[in-house]
UniProtKB/Swiss-Prot annotation:
The keyword Nucleotide-binding applies. Disulfide bonds: none annotated. GO terms for biological process: terpenoid biosynthetic process. It comes from Streptococcus mutans serotype c (strain ATCC 700610 / UA159). Catalyzes the phosphorylation of the position 2 hydroxy group of 4-diphosphocytidyl-2C-methyl-D-erythritol. Keywords: ATP-binding, Kinase, Nucleotide-binding, Transferase. It is an enzyme of class 2 (transferase). The keyword Transmembrane helix does not apply. This is Putative 4-diphosphocytidyl-2-C-methyl-D-erythritol kinase. ATP binds at P94, I95, C96, A97, G98, L99, G100, G101, G102, S103, S104. It catalyses: 4-CDP-2-C-methyl-D-erythritol + ATP = 4-CDP-2-C-methyl-D-erythritol 2-phosphate + ADP + H(+). Pfam families: GHMP_kinases_C, GHMP_kinases_N. The gene is ipk. InterPro entries: GHMP_kinase_C_dom, GHMP_kinase_C_sf, GHMP_kinase_N_dom, IspE, Ribosomal_Su5_D2-typ_SF, Ribsml_uS5_D2-typ_fold_subgr. The lineage of its organism: Bacteria, Bacillati, Bacillota, Bacilli, Lactobacillales. One of its GO terms (molecular function) is ATP binding.
Amino acid sequence: MEIIEKAPAKINLGLDIAGKYQDGFHELSMIMASVDLNDYLTITEIAEDKIVVESNNCKLPLNRKNDVYKAAHLLKRRYHISTGLKISLQKKIPICAGLGGGSSDAAATLRALNCLWKLNLSPKELIDVGFEIGSDVPYCIEAGCALISGKGEIVEPLATTLSTWVVLVKPDFGISTKTIFKEIDMATISRVDIPALKEALLANYYEDALQFMGNSLEDITIAKKPFIQKIKGRMIKCGADIALMTGSGPTVFALCRTEKRADRVVNSMKGFCKEVYKVRML
């Protein structure tokens, strides 16, 4: 039997670092939204009791370091599955970009195997398993627009009908999330009003939502990679409603209410960075 599963990218409409736990992890308060830039996983059962991961992206590890492998191995071991798997991962989401590609791939693997192996796990159970793999995986189980809190394990879907054009620009360098989080100083970090952003999104007030969007990690990442600020400035100059870094970077997204304005931003950025995508917020 073969299953094909889609894994959408995400952007952070709001990312606030609310505090730090005694175990060293940070308390997160974020609003994420899915966009229609997708990876695709094709999962096939094989007779041999092993997990084989292959991908069109040669930069990805295909062993236990890969989140897809981790997800498959975790479910296989926990539910005593004796058959093997071949997982083909068609990557379209840039890696090390702040777009949640690896987490979304892991979540897609969990969803697909839940179906393939007839495990009948609820979304809450999948979220709990996903959190063992990474802090963004719980959100990616159901994706959409959601408020994420705690260490990433608390996911509250938000019923907003706001949708807009999104331009993604990924510069030709990556960022280590661990490196950025090590630089956080709770005394000086910029804060984002997530409750106000949530309220604006639920009311479907686009202009109000724009005012409350932000990313607490931007200043830290831009201090290391000033080119990100140049991307933001160019997007705004071309008519974007807002330009923000997503996650710990380095990808910057612009929101544009009209496709004409989004096209203007795309055309300007194509001569500036190689990886430019025009997508919709789902």
